[in-house]
């Protein structure tokens, strides 16, 4: 009985006694069992393992390269010089290595607070003209952002002034505009180039941003120059002002109606009397249509608020010039033009921008203040300035 029990117990223990060797041999066969259970061919598994290894090695190499690069960068000497504005300011060639204006940090000194201006100067001894290229400005001083534009003039030509277009929302405008001034060689030593930068305000006084006064007698004009110049504070002496005129423009392409609303004027000479505004349309440099406002007496800020409608087909917009002129009776009891504003494809600066805004926003009135310019200067531009192609408004 005991033997039978032992035999039964032995037979009962046999499965457990053989389980130990089975567990011992299960470890080495675990990986092959997993491989056989994956429903992929073996060559795809080998490729996946190889790709993972290459990716891991690449990551390690990238980490090592970044560490070496930072280590070398820290050990570079800091006494190396870079190409800056000082070395290029007195250069006499146009092939200058100029840094990007946006990368220049303003210095703590007072000389840097008004910004910089990049100019190119070229004098033609044959035509006796100096060609001024207004390239760009940088680091202009303003609260927040600004809408800068520039006036360019030469002291020997009173009343002659070039006005750039307005650049919206920037302190580093790219002008890229060129203007010419007639300066005989005998007048070069005493001539001064003046560039004034302004912050455009549509319905208020424009704010000065800085000024450059460059005596041409100190510049070597035997070669083409392109240099950076430091802007100074705005001058205390204001340029000759003939007043300002505010009016709105509205164009409807479907009907071809151009509406001009003369609103008001300000800053007129106190010695003038009975001021009024003439509106004149010119087609192909010939007088086409005209009208005028009522006269306002005894005021330097006359208020008109009078509207005028002209029929101008879309096909004739490229050939039309709009001239608004303030007339007044002076001390000699003779009515003369005080100043003019030219709009159209022959205009420049703010008037050209106003005309373009009218075409871009058809059927909507666009109002703006404009500085009056010399009547002689406007008449000269009408005769000489080539037309600029403008986009036609959508009907």
UniProtKB/Swiss-Prot annotation:
Domain (C2) ranges: 113-229, 241-370
Domain remarks: The first C2 domain/C2A does not mediate Ca(2+)-dependent phospholipid binding.
Topology term for the membrane: Single-pass type III membrane protein
Summary of the function given for this chain in its UniProt record: Involved in the trafficking and exocytosis of secretory vesicles in non-neuronal tissues. Mediates Ca(2+)-regulation of exocytosis acrosomal reaction in sperm. May mediate Ca(2+)-regulation of exocytosis in insulin secreted cells.
Domain of life: Eukaryota
Protein name in the entry: Synaptotagmin-8
Species this chain originates from: Mus musculus (Mouse)
Segments on the Extracellular face: 1-44
Keywords: Cell membrane, Cytoplasm, Cytoplasmic vesicle, Membrane, Repeat, Signal-anchor, Transmembrane, Transmembrane helix
Cytoplasmic side: 66-395
GO molecular function (one): calcium-dependent protein binding
Family: Belongs to the synaptotagmin family.
GO biological process: acrosome reaction
Record localization: Cytoplasm; Cell membrane; Cytoplasmic vesicle, Secretory vesicle, Acrosome
Gene3D superfamilies assigned to the protein according to its UniProt record, in alphabetical order: C2 domain (2.60.40.150)
InterPro entries found in the cross-reference section: C2_dom, C2_domain_sf, Synaptotagmin
């Amino acid at each position: 009985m005991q033997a039978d029990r032992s035999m039964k117990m032995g037979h009962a223990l046999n499965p457990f006694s053989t389980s130990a060797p089975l567990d011992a041999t299960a470890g080495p066969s675990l990986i092959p069992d997993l491989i056989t259970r994956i429903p992929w061919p073996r060559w795809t598994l080998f490729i996946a393992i190889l790709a993972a290894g290459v990716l891991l090695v690449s990551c390690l190499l990238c980490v090592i390269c970044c560490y070496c690069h930072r280590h070398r960068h820290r050990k570079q000497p800091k006494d190396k010089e870079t190409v800056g504005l000082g070395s290029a300011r007195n250069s006499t060639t146009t092939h200058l290595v100029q840094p990007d204006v946006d990368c220049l940090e303003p210095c703590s000194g007072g000389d840097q607070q008004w910004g910089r201006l990049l100019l190119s100067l070229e004098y033609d001894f044959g035509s006796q003209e100096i060609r001024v290229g207004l390239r760009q400005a940088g680091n202009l001083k303003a609260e927040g952002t600004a809408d800068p534009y520039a006036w360019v003039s030469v002291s020997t030509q009173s009343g002659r002034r070039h006005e750039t277009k307005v650049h919206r929302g920037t302190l580093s405008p790219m002008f890229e505009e060129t203007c010419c001034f007639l300066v005989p060689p005998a007048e070069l030593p005493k001539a001064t180039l003046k560039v004034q930068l302004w912050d455009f305000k549509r319905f208020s006084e424009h704010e000065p941003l800085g000024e450059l006064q460059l005596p041409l007698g100190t510049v070597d004009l035997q070669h083409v120059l392109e240099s950076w110049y430091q802007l100074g504070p705005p001058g205390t002496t204001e340029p000759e002002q003939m007043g300002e005129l505010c009016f709105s423009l509205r164009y409807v392409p479907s009907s071809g109606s151009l509406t001009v609303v003369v609103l008001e004027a300000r800053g007129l000479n106190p010695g003038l009397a009975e001021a009024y505004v003439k509106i004149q349309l010119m087609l192909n440099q010939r007088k086409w249509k005209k009208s005028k406002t009522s006269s306002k007496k005894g005021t330097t800020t006359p208020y008109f608020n009078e509207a005028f409608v002209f029929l101008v087909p879309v096909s004739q917009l490229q050939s039309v010039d709009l001239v608004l002129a303030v007339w007044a009776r002076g001390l000699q009891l003779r009515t003369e033009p005080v100043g003019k504003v030219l709009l159209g494809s022959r205009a420049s600066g703010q008037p050209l921008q106003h005309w373009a805004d009218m075409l871009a926003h058809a059927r909507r009135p666009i109002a703006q203040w404009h500085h009056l310019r010399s009547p002689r200067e406007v008449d000269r531009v009408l005769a000489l300035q080539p037309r600029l192609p403008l986009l036609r408004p959508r009907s």
